[in-house]
Amino acid sequence: MEGGNAGCSRQLPERAGPAESEPDVFTTFAVRTLLGLTTKLESVTPKEEEAVLKAFQPLHIDVNTQANNRYERNDNDGVDDSENQHCESCTSDQADPMSGSRAEPELEPEPAGQNEILLPHLRSVQTSLSESDNDAILVQGTLVHTTSDTESDGESKDPDADETGTSKCGLNNAALSAVALDGNNQSKEESDSEGYGHSDDTVGRDDTELHPPISQWLPRKLDSILEHDSSGKDRTLMDEQFSCLLATGECSPELSGEDQRPSADNVSFHKAALTERSFQLPAFFSGLRVRKKGLNTEDGETITEIKPRENDLALLKLRQPVKKSNITSGLTTKKKSSEPKASPTFLEQLSHLLNIDVSKNDERTQDSGAGFGETEDSDEGPENKASGQTEPLFPSEEIKSSPAESALDVFKALFTRPPKKETTADPSELEAIKRKMRNEKESLKAVFERSKSKPGDGPSDKSPDLSPSEQDDKTPGRLQTVWPPPKANHEEVKVGLKYTEAEYQAAILHLKREHKEEIETLKSQFELRVFHIRGEHAVSTAQLEETIAHLKNELDNKLNRRNEEARDIGVSTEDDNLPKTYRNVCIQTDRETFIKPSEEENRAVKNNQIVPKKLNISSLTHSISTQGENKDSYDVPSSESVLSCQPKQMLPPSPPPPPPPPPPPPPPPPPFSDSSLPGLVPPPPPLPTGPTSVTPHFAFGPPLPPQLSEGCRDFQAPAPPAPPPLPGLGPPVPPPLPGSGLPPPPPPPGPGLFFNSTLSSSQGPRKPAIEPSRPMKPLYWTRIQLQGSRKTAIPTLWESLEEPDILDTTEFEYLFSKDTTQEKRKPLSETYEKKTKAKKIIKLLDGKRSQTVGILISSLHLEMKDIQQAILCVDDSVVDLETLEALYENRAQKDELEKIEQYYQTSKEEELKLLDKPEQFLYELSQIPNFTERAQCIIFQSVFSEGITSVHRKVDIITRVSKALLNMTSVKEILGLILAFGNYMNGGNRTRGQADGFGLEILPKLKDVKSRDNRINLVDYVVIYYLRHCDKEAGTDKSIFPLPEPQDFFQASQVKFEDLIKDLRKLKRDLEASEKQMKLVCRESSEEHLQPFKEKLEEFFQKAKEERKKEESSLENAQKCFEETVGYFGIKPKPGEKEITPNYVFTVWYEFCSDFKTIWKRESKSISKERIKVAQQSVSKLTAEKKVETKKINPTASLKERLRQKEANVNAN
């Protein structure tokens, strides 16, 4: 409570000063000294000093500042306090317009005479300050309201009650101050509305009378203040003192203008003031309790947040604002000027001065704090600065004086400066306070000098660079700021960067360099690992291939041994024909045979069949060697092929389920029915071990070699008597020995033998047909149609190539359509448009058919006579093949033609005109003699020429490539190099080394064999070696590519002999059919329409037959040549295939030749360059040897020499 009481008592003089208009200390000391009242004054001083120190203990440094100001002012001059009061009241008026209106009721009881005494002072001080010290006057701040509302309101309601309740801590003046703060805003508005004109009328006379005395002593007082303050705070202290003067001078006129009270109240208020002797703080600190920096907050304290703005932040911390509003006594002064007051007597004025001596001394302590707060207000509110600069210019408007005040002022001016006041406080403590205050003044001086030194800054432009933390360091003991957060710490850190731009760039470059090196290291490690992995993979692949080859060799050896054993033991027996018969029957069975019968049925069948045990392997192998390609022979090539043929074709579509439970033995199964082999009698049952080794292989797939060997051993076991032969076969014929003649005739082939041929022929083209809207020029390419089920070792381009859609077909048709040289004729459809107005169009065709024919008519820009002429004369210059095909396909069918002809016969001429255009077109087309037969012959003529040309080209490419591989010596040289290099690389390996040859499937893989440094591969080395050691013409124009062209191999790889055979057969059938049609036309046509059709067609068919026979023989030769090539190079079929196709062989060569040719071109160029370089060097050597040095004789010099010689000769003569 001590801090709170001190705060209340401290605020009271600040409010009481303006309200009571107490005289300055100079006058008070003079009067008291004159009257001998100094002892009374000194007796009161120790208490107020103790109150000052106790009140400002939490503020740490504020008490030093205010106490030091108080003592310095007491030492220097007493008039300074009144000047400071004047300045404070004026500045507070402009700084915070929130106070004034509510302060008026409490300021009324104060004696008006005391307020009027200082009016002359105010005018002089305001005039001087407005001219020279605008910066000091305008130092103001925005005050944070911390005073509780209940306390202020209670104090403002009843001034009389306040007088009785504040005898100890000066609550009277505190309430006065709090209410004044609340009413500041209203007083600001009222003062604006009332204006200053009213004040001018009442005060103008007194200003002129009282101003000269004040102007004489006021400069002296200011000079004494400036001389005493040696730490650079003279401007700040002057600001504080002027604020006090303004506050004292303006409060009285304002109160007088707002509210009027009777003189009795003034007297009572005056008496209450006389009884007070305790120290009272101004109301400015009434609601504020502050804590020292670093201490904990007490329960009743209120921490005020101070917003730091500019250089005077330390001053801001010295004052704690009130919650309600700031002190604006300038507005209250204006209103007080209009209030009529009773002029007190001279004795009352003197007694009042004696009674308020304690309060006046305390107010000196507060002058510094108030001045500091107002300095901050100047920074917080720019508007306040403007008002502060204009308000002091009119002191006469705000001041009203009376004769008593003027007399007292003249009387007060006569006294000299009072003696220095002696205090009962501890001198050492006061000296310590003064030293601290000097240190603080030095720091604050540096702050303000820094802000003043900035160019272009006005009085209101304070530097905002200082942070709260910086102020705390320079002014220790100031209040700690709570808001805003100390972001200035971050700014202070940024005063100097931790690194420069050059260091930053160097760090970035270093990081980039490290990043690049790390990436290069990772790449090298990755490549090394990949190289090792590839090597390991190649080694493992080679080992696996070696293992596979070894296993294959062992398997072949075992099979050969078993076959020999079977041949030695199983010589011809009496039952040889029956096993073959049984075998053939098994081949002919379908899938149902193996699905329907149960295990008992199978057992019954096996018991009745002795055939599998009597199968002679030697006879079968002999038949393989003698028959060759005859697949329909009686002896199938081997047991493996016999057992694997049927299941591959028949069983995979639906594998048989597990056999059901065995029922009773049924009759023999379907394989032995009369439909398959009539007259077959079931044989007696064989040994029990025989069936188990054969039947499962028929049911579930091709047998494995070990199982076959067991079956062969079973066949060699002795068997019971064989059944009789078939009725139509006669006695059984013994099988021939391995070296004997031809085998017996083969049985009828089973259905499985024809499966492949029917399957491939039934498949059509993969892509739909395209029908352009106009006839296009033919593109004579070799069409390759891939079958959907065809499987090749290496996928071709045509299997994966997707045909894009043509976006703009009209442009393409316009550019590449056939060019007709004849004049443009009207479309055929226009010939039917010249009709009379038809009442109804007659349609005989259905809607879709009529629409199709109508579209055809619209697309044909031809007349019917042109079509007829082209067909009769076999002329394709006018009507091309595509148009003729369209006419042939859309011709009238038999039923349609009957309807149309009947309509023409039964209708009149006018009705015929009503017939629709499609019907008329079809009828006229049918009137061409033998249109169908003639069109078919003409179309076949074109189709045959294209088909036979395609077959010829394919056959020719196969023949040419095969002969090139057989006859070119360079091919043998290259393969010899590869064999030599391969044997050298496989040296020391028992399975791969010392090879006499190699499979050609390795040729495309040679490019994958890299050198140790990965610079070249084996193909590169072979090419380089061949060009430098084998080809004598390497690098010259005579050098020829040593292999067939890769494009020839590619075209040959697309050829299938089966397709060529089918194409020739189809051409043969179509040729025969067309020839019959031609003969029919010749029989039915009249003489006028017979020629030139007959002549041209007969000639065509004769040539077509010859070409077909020629291509058939060429195809046979090509097949033989290809087979010879396959045998020449020792090529074996691809795993899983029986035959060797051109696709497999020529694809291998195509890949190898493509790589070889690319490298060959590159190396040939390099060798050519080397040869040119060598030739140039040799030429240069020859020219250097034969070079004759010749001296160039200057013709001019030689002539002069001759002339000299002549002159010499003449002189000599």
From Swiss-Prot:
Domain of life where this protein originates: Eukaryota
Parts forming coiled coils: 428-450, 503-572, 1050-1125
Biased composition (Pro residues): 650-672, 680-689, 718-751
All residue ranges annotated as the FH2 domain in the record: 766-1182
Record InterPro entries: FH2_Formin (IPR015425), FH2_Formin_sf (IPR042201), Formin_Cappuccino_subfam (IPR001265)
GO terms classed as biological process: actin cytoskeleton organization; actin nucleation
Domain FH1 intervals: 652-751
Compositional bias (Basic and acidic residues): 187-210, 431-464
Region: Disordered, residue numbers: 1-24, 66-111, 144-169, 183-216, 357-489, 624-774, 1193-1213
GO molecular function: microtubule binding
Gene Ontology cellular-component annotations: actin filament; endoplasmic reticulum membrane; nucleus
Tissue specificity remark: Present in the adult brain, kidney, brain, heart and intestine and throughout the embryo.
Database matches in Pfam families: FH2 (PF02181)
Biased composition (Polar residues): 636-647, 755-764
Membrane-spanning ranges: none
Main location: nucleus
Protein localization: Nucleus
Keyword Acetylation: no
UniProtKB keywords: Coiled coil, Developmental protein, Nucleus
SMART domains tied to this protein: FH2
The protein's role, per its UniProt record: Is important for morphogenesis of limb and kidney and may be involved in determining dorsoventral neural tube polarity and motor neuron induction. It may also have a function in differentiated cells or be involved in maintaining specific differentiated states.
Record-stated family: Belongs to the formin homology family. Cappuccino subfamily.
Protein name, UniProt field: Formin
